[in-house]
C-alpha cells in the first residue's frame, strides 16, 4: 500500500505530533510509515509505537533564564554545519535503504535535500520559512538586510520540495505571517492547508468528571498555563506563573503543565485553587474548560488555542523570532496580549491575566477565528496530499 518516510524537527513535540497523526491514519488503511528525528520528538515517536531512526541534532542554544542564547547559538554554527552534513548523509542512507514513495519533512531541511538527491518526491510542512532575528537586532538596517538575504536563500532550499504546506489559515488570518510572508523564492509554492492540530472536543460529561476529580469550580475562571518548548526555557515561566497565581484573586483557578513528556502524569494540588502537572494527560479537557490560556508562542499551541476559541496571554521565549512573530500576530488579531519575557515580573503577568479575563472582546474575537478555522481540516488535507503519492 506504499511507504511514507516522516522526518519531524526534534525540539518540542508539536512537529512530531502532527506527523504521528498523519501516520496513524495511513496505517489504518494499510500503508506503512518510517520516522527519523532527534531529541524529545524521537522519544515521543517511539512512545506512540513507531520505530524512529536517530539523526544528529541541529538546534539552537537556550539560556536557563528562559531565552534564546544568541552568543551560544553563534558559537554552535560550526557544529550546526557539521551535524547538518551528517543529517543529510544519514537521511540519504535511511531513505535509500527503504525507498519510500514520498518523504514528508516537518521543518527539517536535510530530508528534503536527501530526497532530492535520490529523486524521491518530497513534501515539507513548514510554518517558518525564514529565520527571524530578535527585535533588538532588527533595529539595524544591516541586520534586516541579512535577515532578508538569508530568508531568500532558505526559501530557495525549502522550495526543493515538491510541495510546501503551511499548517495555518490563509491570509489575512495567518498566525505565522511574520515567518512565511514576503519571501519571493517560496511565495508561489506555499499552500495553506489549515491547522494540523487534532480536532478534539471533549464531552461535557468527561469535563464534569475531571472537574469533580480535581475540585475545579466550573463557575469560576480557570487559567491553563501550558508550557512548551526547549526544556531549558520552561521552568522560568513555570516559576513566574506560580508567583502570579499568589497575587491574583483566589477565585481565579490555575492548572499549570510543565510539558515534560517523561514527567509524572498525576496532578499535584499546590494551592487552594491550583494544580500542577509535570505532564498533563488531560490537556485537551483542560484547554476546553479554561477561560484563558498562558502560552509561549509556539505555532501548534496557538493553533489549538484558536481551535478551542480561547483568548491568550503569550510570553514568547526571549529573542525567539518565530514565537515573537506568532505572538505579535495573535495580539494584532485581537486574540489576547503578548508580554515580553525579559524583565517580566509576576505582577505584570498577573495584571495581564486579569486584563484579558475582564474584557469579553478577546473571547469574542477568539470564537470568531475558531469558526473560520473549523472550515479547514489541516490534518485531512495533509493526509490526502501524502496519500496521492502512495
Which residue ranges define each predicted feature?
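Donor-nucleotide binding loops and adjacent catalytic segments primarily
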Residues: 23, 197-292, 324
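C-terminal alpha-helical cap of glycosyltransferases
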Residues: 375-390
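Conserved donor-nucleotide binding/catalytic region of nucleotide-linked donor-dependent transferases
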Residues: 336-337, 342, 347-348, 352-369, ...
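A short, glycine/small-residue-rich beta-strand->loop->alpha-helix junction that serves as a flexible
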Residues: 8-20, 232-235
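Conserved nucleotide-sugar phosphate-binding/catalytic loop shared by glycosyltransferases and other
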Residues: 28-29, 34-83, 226
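A nucleotide-sugar donor-handling region in carbohydrate enzymes
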Residues: 142-232, 259-262
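Conserved nucleotide-sugar donor-binding subdomain of glycosyltransferases
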Residues: 69-102, 108-110
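A donor-sugar binding/catalytic signature common to diverse glycosyltransferases
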Residues: 102-106, 282-326
Amino acid at each position: 500500500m506504499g511507504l511514507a518516510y516522516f522526518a519531524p524537527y526534534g525540539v518540542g513535540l508539536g512537529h512530531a505530533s502532527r506527523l504521528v497523526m498523519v501516520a496513524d491514519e495511513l496505517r489504518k488503511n494499510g500503508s506503512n510509515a518510517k520516522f527519523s528525528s532527534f531529541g524529545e520528538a524521537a522519544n515521543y515517536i517511539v512512545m506512540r509505537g513507531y520505530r524512529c531512526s536517530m539523526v544528529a541534532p541541529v538546534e539552537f542554544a537556550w539560556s536557563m533564564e528562559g531565552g534564546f542564547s544568541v552568543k551560544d547559538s553563534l558559537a554552535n554554527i560550526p557544529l550546526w554545519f557539521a551535524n547538518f552534513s551528517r543529517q543529510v548523509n544519514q537521511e540519504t542512507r535511511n531513505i535509500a535503504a527503504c525507498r519510500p514513495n514520498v518523504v514528508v519533512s516537518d521543518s527539517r531541511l536535510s530530508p528534503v535535500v536527501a530526497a532530492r538527491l535520490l529523486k524521491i518526491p518530497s513534501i515539507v510542512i513548514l510554518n517558518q520559512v525564514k529565520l527571524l532575528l530578535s527585535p533588538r537586532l532588527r533595529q539595524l538596517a544591516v541586520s534586516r538586510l541579512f535577515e532578508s538575504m538569508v530568508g531568500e536563500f532558505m526559501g530557495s532550499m525549502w522550495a526543493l520540495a515538491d510541495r510546501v504546506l503551511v499548517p495555518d489559515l490563509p491570509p489575512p488570518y495567518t498566525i505565522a505571517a511574520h515567518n512565511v510572508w514576503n519571501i519571493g523564492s517560496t511565495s508561489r509554492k506555499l499552500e495553506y492547508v489549515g491547522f494540523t492540530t487534532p480536532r478534539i472536543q471533549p464531552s461535557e460529561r468527561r469535563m464534569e468528571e475531571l472537574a469533580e476529580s480535581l475540585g475545579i469550580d466550573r463557575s469560576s475562571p480557570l487559567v491553563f498555563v501550558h508550557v512548551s518548548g526547549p526544556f531549558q526555557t520552561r521552568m522560568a515561566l513555570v516559576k513566574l506563573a506560580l508567583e502570579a497565581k499568589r497575587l491574583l484573586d483566589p477565585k481565579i483557578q490555575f492548572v499549570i503543565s510543565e510539558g515534560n513528556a517523561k514527567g509524572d502524569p498525576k496532578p499535584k494540588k499546590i494551592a487552594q485553587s491550583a494544580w500542577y502537572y509535570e505532564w498533563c494527560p488531560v490537556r485537551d479537557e483542560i484547554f476546553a474548560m479554561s477561560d484563558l490560556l498562558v502560552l509561549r508562542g509556539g505555532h501548534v499551541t496557538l493553533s489549538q488555542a484558536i481551535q478551542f476559541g480561547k483568548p491568550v496571554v503569550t510570553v514568547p521565549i526571549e529573542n525567539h523570532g518565530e514565537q515573537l512573530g506568532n505572538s505579535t500576530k495573535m495580539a494584532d488579531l485581537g486574540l489576547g496580549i503578548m508580554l515580553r519575557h525579559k524583565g517580566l515580573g509576576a505582577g505584570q503577568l498577573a495584571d495581564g491575566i486579569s486584563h484579558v479575563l475582564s474584557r469579553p472582546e478577546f473571547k469574542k474575537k477568539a470564537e470568531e477565528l475558531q469558526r473560520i478555522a473549523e472550515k479547514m481540516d489541516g490534518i485531512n488535507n495533509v493526509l490526502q496530499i501524502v496519500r496521492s503519492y502512495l
